Design a protein with these regions (language model features):
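Bacterial N-terminal signal peptides that target proteins for export
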Residues: 1-7
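Predominantly soluble domains enriched in secretory-pathway, periplasmic, or organellar proteins
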Residues: 5, 20-350
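C-terminal motif of bacterial Sec signal peptides marking the signal peptidase cleavage site
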Residues: 15-18
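Short, linear, compositionally biased motifs with a strong N-terminal bias
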Residues: 10-13
Length: 350
């Protein structure tokens, strides 16, 4: 396929490439279930998507390849289902796939700014728009016609969430070790410009907002030395930032009824990973709800946490060497299933 180059007039100069790709009739997505995105290993071009059915406890591996006859790419970063379409960010391959529910490619979106390709990271969606962070310092807004606007934010933006009429973008500065960034950009959804920045802990990563827009939660990795990982909350009415009392936070995920699931990990004195622990937090009242797992299940090499539309909580476990395991929990904190993701580093369930 030869991409078509579209030159658009926006607040910043950039280029968007779009590819359409028909596929044979190979449906992989049932009436209910969850996509599992395996990030893969950097440089190995081995990201993939499988489909898990929690009712049948069945898993169809590499469903994207089955639908399209091509590999997904290098380092799968995020997956979003919105308005009957699936969006997949492939970071190192610097592309976004837009597919139907069976993972058949409808569009492939490659963005440029100032003559350089951009690397997509994390999605959010609101008001018929899909937003995506680009690691080169931009937030993108994708419209239904696949046109794209860009807004310059801070260095190496990662997570993004919507609270009220604003987008909150975590500027990690992840490529500037050991002098990481420590800001969150506040971007208006109306003007699509950066309105302000808020200082937080260094190396901010994931963002989640309460449904009433009152609170925005930010997890950060710290500098891996004297500044530890943290979970903080921004009160949007006054941009105040408060530390929450969770230790070694590695990932967060917003669930139903404004419950925030907090995955905490860490290492022993010999740098061996400790089993993950999950806590719950009420996002609307900003109050702890205690431990999540109620049946004693342990989570070795915990890597990621997601809450899917099916209501189950998915925890990806990975040693970065062999195929990962995914633990599936009910909202009551009991293990529903465990399966081999048949890929490296299961990073997201949706």
């Amino acid at each position: 396929m030869k991409p078509t180059k579209l030159i658009l007039s926006i607040c910043l100069t950039f280029t968007l490439f779009s590819c359409e790709s028909p596929a044979e009739d190979t449906p992989v997505h049932g009436s209910s279930g969850t996509y599992i995105l395996n990030s893969g290993n950097w440089g190995d071009n081995d990201a993939n998507i499988g489909f898990y059915n929690p009712t049948e406890k069945s898993f169809a591996a590499d469903a994207f390849y089955a639908a399209n006859g091509q590999k997904l790419g290098d380092v799968g970063q995020d997956i979003l289902v919105y308005d009957d379409l699936v969006y997949v960010a492939i970071n190192t391959s610097q592309t976004i796939f837009v597919t139907d529910s069976d993972l058949k490619i409808k569009k492939q979106l490659d963005a440029e700014a100032d003559g350089a390709r951009l690397s997509p990271r994390v999605f959010a969606a609101h008001g018929n728009k899909v937003y995506v962070t680009y690691y080169e310092g931009y937030l993108g807004e994708i419209s239904k016609d696949y046109s794209l606007r860009l807004c310059a934010v801070g260095p190496n933006p990662d997570g993004v969430a919507i609270a009220g009429d604003n987008l909150y973008v975590a500027n990690s500065g992840g490529m500037s070790y050991p002098t990481y960034n420590n800001t969150v950009s506040v971007v208006s959804t109306d003007s699509f410009t950066e309105a302000s920045t808020i200082e937080v802990n260094v190396n901010p990563a994931m963002v989640a907002a309460s449904s009433d827009g009152k609170y925005v939660y930010i997890s950060s990795f710290g500098n891996y030395a004297d500044q530890p990982a943290k979970l903080q909350v921004i009160t949007t009415s006054n941009a105040g930032v408060t530390d929450l009392e969770y230790q070694s936070v590695s990932a967060i995920a917003k669930g139903k009824n404004d419950v925030l699931y907090i995955l905490c990990g860490g290492y022993d004195e010999n740098w061996n990973p400790l089993p993950g622990t999950i806590y719950k937090h009420d996002m609307k009242t900003n109050s702890p709800l205690g431990a999540f797992v109620t049946d004693g299940t342990t989570l070795p090499n915990s890597y990621s946490i997601s809450v899917a539309a099916d209501g189950y909580i998915y925890v990806g476990c990975s040693d970065y060497k062999t195929t990962g395991d995914v633990y599936v929990f009910s909202k009551e904190g009991k293990l529903h299933d465990k399966f081999d993701s048949q890929g490296l580093n299961p990073i997201k369930a949706f």
